[in-house]
Swiss-Prot record:
<feature type="region of interest" description="Dimerization">
    <location>
        <begin position="109"/>
        <end position="205"/>
    </location>
</feature>
<dbReference type="GO" id="GO:0006357">
    <property type="term" value="P:regulation of transcription by RNA polymerase II"/>
</dbReference>
<dbReference type="InterPro" id="IPR036388">
    <property type="entry name" value="WH-like_DNA-bd_sf"/>
</dbReference>
<dbReference type="GO" id="GO:0005737">
    <property type="term" value="C:cytoplasm"/>
</dbReference>
<dbReference type="GO" id="GO:0003700">
    <property type="term" value="F:DNA-binding transcription factor activity"/>
</dbReference>
<keyword id="KW-0970">Cilium biogenesis/degradation</keyword>
<dbReference type="Pfam" id="PF16421">
    <property type="entry name" value="E2F_CC-MB"/>
</dbReference>
<dbReference type="GO" id="GO:0009887">
    <property type="term" value="P:animal organ morphogenesis"/>
</dbReference>
<dbReference type="GO" id="GO:0001216">
    <property type="term" value="F:DNA-binding transcription activator activity"/>
</dbReference>
<feature type="region of interest" description="Transactivation">
    <location>
        <begin position="277"/>
        <end position="335"/>
    </location>
</feature>
<dbReference type="GO" id="GO:0005635">
    <property type="term" value="C:nuclear envelope"/>
</dbReference>
<dbReference type="GO" id="GO:0046983">
    <property type="term" value="F:protein dimerization activity"/>
</dbReference>
<feature type="region of interest" description="Disordered">
    <location>
        <begin position="226"/>
        <end position="285"/>
    </location>
</feature>
<comment type="similarity">
    <text>Belongs to the E2F/DP family.</text>
</comment>
<dbReference type="InterPro" id="IPR037241">
    <property type="entry name" value="E2F-DP_heterodim"/>
</dbReference>
<dbReference type="GO" id="GO:0001650">
    <property type="term" value="C:fibrillar center"/>
</dbReference>
<keyword id="KW-0804">Transcription</keyword>
Amino acid sequence: MAAAEPTSSAQPTPQAQAQPPPHGAPSSQPSAALAGGSSRHEKSLGLLTTKFVSLLQEAQDGVLDLKAAADTLAVRQKRRIYDITNVLEGIDLIEKKSKNSIQWKGVGAGCNTKEVIDRLRCLKAEIEDLELKERELDQQKLWLQQSIKNVMEDSINNRFSYVTHEDICNCFHGDTLLAIQAPSGTQLEVPIPEMGQNGQKKYQINLKSHSGPIHVLLINKESSSSKPVVFPVPPPDDLTQPSSQSSTSVTPQKSTMAAQNLPEQHVSERSQTFQQTPAAEVSSGSISGDIIDELMSSDVFPLLRLSPTPADDYNFNLDDNEGVCDLFDVQILNY
């Protein structure tokens, strides 16, 4: 018997897979970006966020409707808008007013976010200008410090690095001066002056130091032609010894004339540093006991002669606003 031949109606075997195009051949399928007519950058979330924030800045009172924003930005998937709002809300830049509206924080009625940004730019420009001026001042300061250093280190100028009593009196003409040399940390207090019985104010100065002694000099000059009168405060004991010919009552005019006749004191003590140190204390006998007695007995003598402390210990403390004068029953003199 002859074998049966295959019929012509049999289906051919299907192909496995289409072979990829050769390397370098152009693709037959156009990209989705070109087919849609827009690039991938235009559909990115970053660009969409920039446009969304611009709408938020231009919105009245900073309130933006999300549906209107989606229509304006032509966003088909509203999920992308919600992704942006979730991030902004997470960093506390916006808050939800309702289900479909948000508001930029810190924007009140009648205020626009764009105006705030313009104001911020002006402030930044002002800060840059101030920083430029600060750098110029710092440069000027460095130049001055270097100039002072050059002057002080010069061997010729070193001999003149001191101030005389005459120089100080010329700066404060007609005033009674107290030159104070005190350690660092000294507390200075000037209470409010009180009116005396004669209508003049009573002035006080309280000094307190915990680290060292305080030295005070009284510097006075009656006229431009006279020499400065300088002696320590309080005066030494040898200057305040009672004289056999002391006067019991001296008028203020006599006290003034006596002050003009005081001998000249040494006033040119040098200093190798910038600190202004008072001149050396006057030697004993430079001011006669008669003149000191006349000054102390007058009504205008600015120094207080305190009585000796009692033999018993002092069992009380002074407050921070109290001074040594509070330990004695004395009347404050008028200056």
